[in-house]
Curated annotation (Swiss-Prot):
GO terms for cellular component: IRE1-TRAF2-ASK1 complex. Its EC number is 2.7.11.1. ATP binds at L956, G957, R958, G959, S960, N961, G962, T963, L964, K979. Residues 267-320, 416-457, 707-746, 802-887, 1084-1113 are annotated as: Disordered. This is Probable serine/threonine-protein kinase irlF. The keyword Metal-binding does not apply. Residues 950-1235 form the Protein kinase domain. Residues 1238-1400 form the KEN domain. InterPro entries: IRE1/2-like, KEN_dom, KEN_sf, Kinase-like_dom_sf, Prot_kinase_dom. Residues 689-801, 842-933 form a coiled coil. Keywords: ATP-binding, Coiled coil, Kinase, Nucleotide-binding, Serine/threonine-protein kinase, Transferase. Residues 863-882 have a biased composition (Basic and acidic residues). The active site is at D1074.
Length: 1400
């Protein structure tokens, strides 16, 4: 489930609520999903979102939530697991996100171990060689010797450049934390971190791993590998081996066996005939030792110089590993200036029985297995001191050929004749050496092999005790008693398979462990080994499943006999829990790919490969997230190979048959088994026992019962899910029906609207047609009118006068002449012309008659059209009411249906309202008696007189050890805070109840009050005063200023509330031990008074107490959470068992160092709280919680935010001092000038003036004494350290007459003042305060004389009303005057009696 940034903000970064919501949504139980994975998903998402989110750019809330999560117990395992998974699977996508996440881890203080816990002298003497004269005495304590190897390992790792991430992270850790880290790396297969931490890189040229077979030619092994074996416990052996083998392919060949560890045993046996030549060579070599020593001395001097240079370069406090006990005598590794910081010391190894001088180097194991060491160079003194520890620890003899230095124990003679030989000349030394060599060789030739074996085993038994419980001890022990490397691998991997009484080891089936070596060297092994489950070797090991699969497949690749495959399958049948295991699809794919790469398998078993590939593709497509069963995989392979599985036969009989001596097959590795130490009697005992007992049947029954239980659980879950789904489906159907019912009337309305729109469109079309017709009629009428006009014109022409007629006749005659001329041109006959003339009037009459007829027809058409329109209108009028009726009927039906639905909904609502009314009626009494309602649902709790609800919305706070605080009611009347605590922590509960009862009886106004106590089987419930919010809530939500304004108090008065509460605790010998802003609560007057008045019958009170103590002022602070407090009887020291962790940064050094705690612990916490209050949420040791503890340990304080208020700085700086003896008592805190009232400040000014007068009188001069001069100079307090010193800067940068209104305030005064002297300023302030009434009277007279008084006079007149306003005026003009006088007069507090009350 992916979480959005908005969801995280909604839950206010409460990851537990998010996790619960996740489980509910997915129907998961707590065992099926991990809370840690939910948190890590949220944190990674926030790392990606917050840097780009403008709304939440600060990310302070995220950082606080992150480190709260980091402080939980599973942090390191989770981070390493997530880092390994993300980097191996999706490195390209998620590396950037996790880099941001891991960068925060590097700065974390969760595993902080103080560097000062280690003995700094030991560190400097052993690991930081600042000069060659740092000697370690031979009589060191045993404790220093025991921790040498551990510190040697961790320092050699921390100095590694390639592991900078982890080395910075674990800079201040101890050796045990490093082992824990390595265990987690092994557990979660975090190979990347392992490479960085232990320098396992192929590409590194400087620190390249050199691991080769332990043969006679090359005996080199990496120190890093053996160091891993040193710090690895047996339980985590298999993951360690996977990491080692992945990075060192030849590691299996270099595992020490008896032949490789005790040396040169077989070499000497093979070369018995050449002993004389060896002795001669040895003598020659010994004769040349003197020459070699001279050269080596020069080299060693250079080496010492280089060591000094390296130490000077690395003098920043980092522990550097200057040397490592491995080396190679090559010229390129001379100790020149360019050589690395690792100074390798070449040495030779000598066995007391077999003298060997031809070897030039030795591996790490032979160094510890040899009984003596001789160096062919001069040994550095500091290096020799460390080797001396090895000699003491393991009993080795060490010798150097150097002339300058020789170890007191002579190497050449094991008896008592060694000391004298060391003092002889070089020739004598050579002779003695030759004699000793000859004696040793003779002894070697004369000793029997059996005695050699016994001595060798005795020496190895000594080494088994080195780092007991680690893999290196197992290597030593198994190499001493067995001959085969398979035993060591078996032990390293923890594969002591089955019960050793009747089951054999798989490793004994193969010669020299070839098959398992092949599978471990496979390039796919790293994925197959990644099993998330982990169990110790004594339990069933699910991590063996991939090994068994590959071992079985390797049999095929090596073309082994199928009988061996039967043995593997029988082993799985005997260990059925392993057989029923599963592998992931990725592992299955790796198996298929591995088989494809094997040519022999591809040739012989192609059908099996195709089937496996088909199964893999099928599973990958359909169910890629589901694992694949092991038994199915083995069954498929086995059927194709025709290797039967013994299901119904006796398993042990088949195994016994395999071990019989008669079974001989030259091609089978079983032929060598008779030579091995196989106990056949144990196998036969197992056979008889299995025949007599029904052990397998019992196992089958148990498995069947488990299956039935799991099936039942699954069925129950299915039924529950089905019920939930049915309910959801029903709800969905009801919602759909409702929507449909609402949609039907809407659809009808839409349909009606469509019909109306269509009718409107038709009407519009008809209107348009009518308009067109009307236009046509108008055109016709116009034409008729024109014709009529023409006719009228003709008639008028006929009626014209004779003149006009004559004119017309003349015109006509002209026309006729023209016509005649035309006729002539056309050659027309005269009769034709006459006919034309006669036809003209007839044509005219015909035209007129035709026009009349057309006009009549048009009129008739218009009449018909009008009649049709009338008829249509009538029809429409008749149809409209019918349509309206239909629509109205439809609307009525819809309204009826809607009303029915509304009535149904109303009924449902009424039922809900009735239920709610019933609830309200049932809780009316609670409503009337209390300020809030408790809903009686599933989470409702009623215990004794307490009633509350366990819903999360009703939780007021959470504490340690599962403590919860609920909002509830006591006696059905009084609202209280109910604190639920587990009975498993009875000491704390009794302690808190005892403290609360005593405080309640004493009636403290600034402490939370105890009301009542109830308990049940599991919990104890305490009723406490119900408060509003905490100081932390006010600050974080920006409501502190609002609270101060509404309280009617100043900031100093509110701070005094907290101090009064602490004073009350200390006066009754109670140390709170856990003061922080969360435990400072707010309480209003009304609420407190009501609660106190109603609970008087239950609470015991003192009859002699004052009435004022029962009433709190408006919005005061009170102290709560006394779960960690301690009632003191004999002294003021607190020895609580449940010590605070100090993670919030409100505990001093002594708490972090688990020392005894006194009242000064509360003083330190109170100082941090006062700084928090005065600066609105800041911390004196930094706001970043990562570095608070670090800054507290180093006393890095920053009070610059209070630079304007030097009194507060002075008080807080003394309260948070690193030295508890320098912190003030609570009475001294209350007596500090920061909390003085006006009267006490005026008294202090009078006392200062008296001292100035006495100093003048004693000095004999006119104010020239040292004290009065010192008043003029500034006294500076350092805001970041404890060092305070006076400076030569003047207290005032200008004369004080320019700072105050001297003219108006000195009216009527005849005194003279020096404005550059502070003593005169004190005298002026004192005179103004004493004579302020006279000064005010004179100023008022001036105002009366002036017609318009100035603003300055009015202001001064207002100031002189009382002493408070006057002192406030001077403090505003000269802010730090009281602080300056307080610090200057502190030296004289013991000399003058009237000053004692101001400083005690």
């Amino acid at each position: 489930m992916n979480f959005n940034f908005e969801q995280i903000l909604e839950y206010n970064f409460d990851f537990k609520k998010l996790h619960k919501n996740k489980l509910k949504n997915n129907n998961l139980s707590e065992n099926e999903d991990d809370y840690a994975t939910t948190v890590i998903e949220c944190l990674i998402h926030l790392c990606e979102v917050i840097p780009t989110n403008k709304i939440y750019s600060g990310a302070n809330k995220f950082i606080s939530c992150f480190y709260e999560f980091m402080n939980e117990r599973f942090i390191e395992t989770l981070v390493l697991e997530f880092y390994d998974l993300m980097t191996t699977d999706n490195s390209k996508v998620t590396t950037g996100i996790f880099d941001q996440f891991f960068s925060l881890i590097k700065k974390s203080d969760i595993i902080y171990k103080s560097f000062y816990e280690w003995d700094s002298n030991i560190l400097e003497n052993r690991f930081i060689f600042k000069n060659n004269n740092n000697n370690i005495d031979g009589d060191d304590d045993d404790g220093n010797e025991d921790d040498y190897f551990g510190r040697f390992s961790i320092l050699s790792i921390l100095e590694d450049d390639n592991s900078h991430i982890i080395s910075n992270y674990f800079k201040f850790t101890n050796y045990e934390r490093l082992e824990d880290l390595w265990i987690m790396i092994c557990h979660y297969q975090a190979t990347d971190i392992a490479k960085a931490l232990f320098n396992l890189y192929y590409d590194s040229k400087e620190d390249c791993i050199s691991v080769f077979a332990s043969d006679d030619n090359n005996n080199k092994i990496s120190i890093s590998i053996l160091r891993i074996l040193e710090i690895t416990s047996i339980e985590f052996s298999l993951p360690v081996l996977t990491v080692i083998v992945e990075n060192t392919p030849n590691f299996l060949n270099s595992i020490p066996t008896k032949t490789s560890m005790l040396g040169m045993k077989f070499k000497l046996h093979n070369n018995n005939n050449n002993n004389n030549n060896n002795n001669n060579n040895n003598n020659n070599n010994n004769n040349n030792n003197n020459n070699n020593n001279n050269n080596n001395n020069n080299n060693n001097n250079n080496n010492n110089n280089n060591i000094n240079k390296n130490n000077n370069d690395n003098g920043n406090g980092k522990a550097e590993n200057i040397y490592r006990l491995s080396g190679d005598c090559k010229e390129k590794e001379k100790y020149d200036n360019n050589y690395s910081r690792e100074t390798e010391i070449p040495f030779k190894v000598f066995d007391t029985k077999f003298l060997i001088t031809t070897m030039e180097c030795s591996d790490y194991i032979r160094f510890f297995t040899s009984s003596s060491i001789i160096f062919n160079t001069e040994v550095n003194q500091t290096c020799y001191d460390d080797l001396k520890l090895i000699q003491k620890r393991l009993g080795f003899l060490i010798y150097s050929n150097s002339n300058k230095f020789t170890y007191p124990f002579d190497f050449w003679n094991n008896n008592n004749n060694n000391n004298n030989n060391n003092n002889n000349n070089n020739n004598n030394n050579n002779n003695n050496n030759n004699n000793n060599n000859n004696n040793n060789n003779n002894n070697n030739n004369n000793n029997n092999n059996n005695n050699n074996n016994k001595n060798d085993d005795d020496e190895l038994e000594k080494l088994v005790e080195y780092r007991k419980g680690s893999l290196i001890s197992l290597v030593f022990s198994f190499a001493g008693y067995r001959f085969f490397s398979s035993y060591i691998i078996e032990n390293l991997t923890g594969t002591n398979i089955g019960n050793p009484n009747y089951v054999f080891d798989i490793s004994e089936l193969m010669t020299d462990f070839e098959i398992i070596r092949g599978l471990l060297l496979s390039k796919y092994f790293s994925i197959l080994f990644k099993s998330r489950k982990f169990t110790v070797p004594t339990l069933t090991r699910s991590t063996l499943i991939p090994i068994l699969i590959f071992a079985f497949i390797s049999n095929i690749s090596y073309d082994m006999n199928c009988n061996i495959a039967n043995v593997y399958l029988n082993y799985l049948l005997l260990n059925r829990e392993l057989y029923k295991g599963s592998i992931s699809i990725s592992q299955f794919g790796c198996i298929v790919n591995y088989l494809k790469c094997q040519n022999e398998i591809e040739k012989q078993y192609s059908g099996c490969l195709k089937l496996l590939e088909g199964l893999y593709n099928h599973k990958k497509e359909k169910s890629p997230n589901e694992p694949y069963r092991i038994d199915l995989l083995f069954g498929v392979i086995n059927d194709r190979l025709k290797a039967p599985i013994f299901i119904n036969k006796d398993k042990y009989e088949s195994l016994y048959f395999v071990y019989q001596e008669d079974y001989q097959n030259p091609s089978d590795p079983f032929r060598v088994l008779p030579t091995r130490s196989v106990d056949l009697s144990k196998i036969s005992e197992g056979i008889s026992r299995m025949k007599n007992d029904d052990f397998l049947n019992e196992l089958e029954k148990e498995e069947k019962q488990k299956k039935l239980k799991t099936k039942q659980k699954k069925k129950i879950k299915k039924l529950e899910n089905e019920k939930k789904q049915k309910v959801l489906q029903q709800d969905k159907q009801q919602e759909k029906e409702k929507k449909q019912n609402y949609q039907q009337p809407q659809d009808l309305q839409q349909h009606n609207l469509k019909i109306q729109t269509q009718q409107q469109q038709q009407q519009q079309q008809q209107q348009q047609q009518q308009q067109q017709q009307q236009q046509q009629q108008q055109q016709q009428q116009q034409q008729q009118q024109q014709q009529q006009q023409q006719q009228s014109q003709q008639q008028q022409q006929q009626q014209q006068s004779p003149q006009q007629q004559s004119q017309q006749q003349s015109q006509q005659s002209q026309q006729k002449s023209q016509q005649q001329s035309q006729q002539k041109s056309q050659q027309q006959s005269p009769p034709q012309q006459q006919q034309q003339q006669s036809q003209q009037p007839q044509q005219q009459s015909q035209q007129q008659s035709q026009q009349k007829q057309k006009h009549q027809k048009q009129q008739q058409q218009q009449k018909q059209e009008k009649q049709q329109q009338k008829q249509e209108k009538q029809q429409q009028k008749q149809e409209k009411p019918q349509q309206k009726q239909q629509l109205e009927n439809q609307i009525k039906n819809l309204k009826i249906e809607i009303k029915k639905e509304e009535e149904n909904n109303k009924e449902i609502k009424n039922k809900k309202e009735e239920v709610e009314k019933e609830k309200e009626e049932n809780n009316k009494e609670i409503k009337s008696k209390s300020e809030f309602i408790i809903v009686e649902d599933e989470d409702f709790v009623s215990i004794g007189k307490f009633k509350f609800n366990r819903n999360e919305s009703n939780i007021l706070g959470r504490g340690s050890n599962g403590t919860l605080v609920f909002k509830g009611i006591w006696s059905d009347k009084i609202p209280v805070a109910i604190k639920q605590m587990q009975k498993a922590f009875n000491p704390l509960i009794n302690k808190e109840v005892e403290a609360l009862i005593t405080l309640t009886n004493k009636n403290c106004s600034n402490m939370i009050r105890y009301i009542d106590k109830e308990e049940d089987k599991h919990f104890v419930y305490l009723g406490l005063t119900l408060c509003d919010v905490s100081l932390q809530y006010l600050v974080e939500n920006g409501k502190l200023n609002e609270f101060i304004n509404s309280s009617g108090k100043s900031l100093n008065e509110l701070a005094k509330d907290i101090i009064n509460g602490v004073q009350f605790l200390h006066s009754h010998d109670i140390v709170h031990n856990d003061l922080n802003p969360r435990n400072i609560l707010t309480l209003s007057t009304n609420k407190n008074n009501n609660n106190n008045n109603k609970s008087n019958n239950k609470i015991k009170s003192n009859n002699n107490s004052n009435n004022n103590s029962n009433n709190n002022s408006n919005n005061s602070f009170i102290i709560s959470d006394l779960g960690l407090s301690k009632m003191e009887v004999e002294s003021s020291y607190s020895f609580t068992t449940n010590v605070p962790t100090g993670q919030g940064g409100y505990h001093p050094v002594e708490v972090l160092q688990s020392k005894r705690m006194t009242k000064s612990v509360d003083i330190f916490s109170l100082g941090c709280i006062l700084f928090y209050l005065f600066t609105n949420g800041q911390h004196p040791f930094g706001n970043d919680k990562l570095f608070r503890i670090y800054n507290i340990m180093l006393n890095k304080v920053n009070l610059e935010l209070l630079g304007h208020n030097l009194l507060a700085c002075d008080l807080i700086k003394s309260m948070i001092s690193n030295d508890e003896s320098k912190r003030p008592t609570i009475e001294n805190v209350l007596n500090h000038p920061l909390f003085w009232n006006v009267e006490k400040k005026i008294q202090f000014i009078d006392a200062a003036l008296n001292i100035c007068k006495e100093s003048n009188n004693s000095g004999g001069g006119g104010g020239g004494n040292k004290f009065n001069k010192s008043l003029n100079y500034l006294f500076v307090i350092s805001l970041s350290s404890d060092y305070i010193e006076p400076k030569s800067e003047p207290f005032l940068k200008q004369t004080w007459d320019k700072l105050i209104d001297i003219n108006n305030l000195s009216i009527g005064s005849t005194s003279q003042y020096q404005y550059d002297q502070i003593k005169d300023l004190i005298r002026f302030i004192r005179n103004t305060i004493v004579h302020h009434k006279d000064i005010k009277r004179l100023i008022q007279q001036q105002q009366q004389q002036q017609k318009q008084p100035t603003i300055e006079l009015q202001f001064i007149n207002n100031i002189l009303t009382n002493q408070d306003s006057i002192l406030f005026y001077f403090e505003s003009k000269i802010p730090n005057l009281i602080y300056h006088l307080y610090k200057q007069l502190k030296e004289y507090s013991s000399s003058f009696d009237y000053l004692i009350k101001f400083y005690n």
